[in-house]
Amino acid sequence: MKLIAGLGNPGKKYERTRHNVGFMVVDELSFRHQTPWKKSKFNGMTSEIIVGGEKMILVKPLTFMNASGECIRPLMDYYNIPIEDVVIVYDDLDLPVGKIRLRQKGSAGGHNGMKSIIQHVKTQEFNRIRVGVSRPLKGEVINYVLGDFPKAEQPDIIAAIQKSADAIEDFAQTPFIEVMNKYNQK
């Protein structure tokens, strides 16, 4: 069993923002597999998919970004999912829009959702997919990440969401290091 957490903020006003690209990836997986979202007792929405016989629990924390770990850790404990079977999907300002990077460990890199998860799981050594949203040319980062993708960037971000979902489906049957090597080369 795997736990796939897409990071974002709950609520309609955040739905299409850069900061919610993690939610968009797990929504894509739920859509592909036609599985419903249900409110969990761990302050998140969950959906279960089966890929190649492997159950994957998709989760969208409802804690708001900065407290994502408060949802992830209890789900790991409840389902008895080891850290190596967890993937966190989140937005990354340091990658161009539409690029993805898979990693098995690393710092939070200034991302508050990742800081919360690292604090709650007590390690930086877990799988992650960083989805590029680029940096603003000028202005505040907060307003930028809470803004929607402009029309010109939508084809690139849709492709990144698809590619991230493909990588997660591959992870159902393939060690993450191999998935990482495959998708980081593209």
UniProtKB/Swiss-Prot annotation:
Record-annotated site: Discriminates between blocked and unblocked aminoacyl-tRNA: N9
UniProt entry tagged with the keyword tRNA-binding: yes
Keywords, ordered alphabetically: Cytoplasm, Hydrolase, RNA-binding, tRNA-binding
Source domain of life: Bacteria
CDD domains: PTH
GO molecular function: peptidyl-tRNA hydrolase activity; tRNA binding
Residues where tRNA binds: Y14, F64, N66, N112
Subunit: Monomer.
Family: Belongs to the PTH family.
Protein name: Peptidyl-tRNA hydrolase
Native source species: Listeria monocytogenes serovar 1/2a (strain ATCC BAA-679 / EGD-e)
Gene responsible for this protein: pth
